[in-house]
Amino acid sequence: MSIQINSAHDIRVEYRGHFYAEDELRESIWLVNMELRNGLPRRERIEAKRQIAEMEAALKALVTAEGAGR
């Protein structure tokens, strides 16, 4: 996982080949949670839970990097 810092206010983390800001990651986690609540087939449910765990780890790394940069 890599962190990209464009300025003091634009810190992004890489997740699956794309760079995300904190609000984008939070929105993505929320959307996947909504899909889980609406019901998914077993395989898709397992993948969604894995994605949430990965995105939460990326979000934690991003928040840590933002805290260290202040």
Q: Residues of each region from the PLM?
A:
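Short intrinsically disordered terminal tails
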Residues: 1-7, 61-70
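Intrinsic-disorder-associated interaction segments
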Residues: 14, 18, 44, 48-52
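Charged, low-complexity interaction regions
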Residues: 34-46
